[in-house]
């Protein structure tokens, strides 16, 4: 193993991660691999694997999804050429599926899923997690997406789940603004899938919602350029209903 390869693994293993140091170590290893006359094929293959995998994970931490998209595709090519070094393939594939969901690239999501054996789609946690999330999104069971964050196979999934939740909340909020004259802060917290009142209050302030005591008051425009997304309203209201039913049971 080259010194640059060892250094990359050591820097990556440190907590909390120094992203600048990791990027520097990646660049150093890239230079070594570009002139790898001193490395045998096995050493070069292992170094390339760690280079690609850590580049993928670093891109997630930096929210650099263009770089992520580039490296994750290189990763798939690598695993095809070096299956003996593919112990992290399921993690990488799962992260790719999560990215495609978060980017709303559903056709690409299903194309990638078709390449994965059916058994792995249900039995492997890295793969089954994005599969379940996609089903929940299609069903409008957004509360299940929230619950998924509490039981994920890798912390790197969290960023993609939060991107999806941000998108869901924006859609629900837009529908609320066009469909409700008055909504209690408590009901808004449930409908927007927040854990507590403070999160709801911050979100309301960002949307410039008018809070009158314990309720939000909206001005509904008579003429709307776009029709209300009734399905989003239905799902949000359904979420509120189920939450109230659960409170009664408890």
From Swiss-Prot:
Disruption outcome: RNAi-mediated knockdown results in sterility.
Domain of life, per the record? Eukaryota
Instruction: Name one cellular component (GO) term.
Output: proteasome regulatory particle, lid subcomplex
Gene3D superfamilies of this UniProt entry?
Answer: 1.25.40.990
Instruction: Specify one Pfam family.
Output: CSN8_PSD8_EIF3K
Gene Ontology biological process terms from the UniProt entry = proteasome-mediated ubiquitin-dependent protein catabolic process
Q: Where is the PCI domain?
A: 63-233
Q: Does the keyword Zinc apply?
A: no
The reply on keyword Cell wall biogenesis/degradation is no
Q: Which UniProt keywords apply?
A: Proteasome
InterPro entries per record: 26S_Psome_Rpn12, CSN8_PSD8_EIF3K, PCI_dom
Q: What biological function has been recorded for the protein in this entry?
A: Acts as a regulatory subunit of the 26S proteasome which is involved in the ATP-dependent degradation of ubiquitinated proteins.
Against PANTHER family, the record matches this protein to: 26S PROTEASOME NON-ATPASE REGULATORY SUBUNIT 8 (PTHR12387:SF0)
Task: Give the similarity note.
Answer: Belongs to the proteasome subunit S14 family.
Name it. Answer: 26S proteasome non-ATPase regulatory subunit 8
Supply the source organism's classification. Answer: Eukaryota, Metazoa, Ecdysozoa, Nematoda, Chromadorea
User: Gene symbol?
Assistant: rpn-12
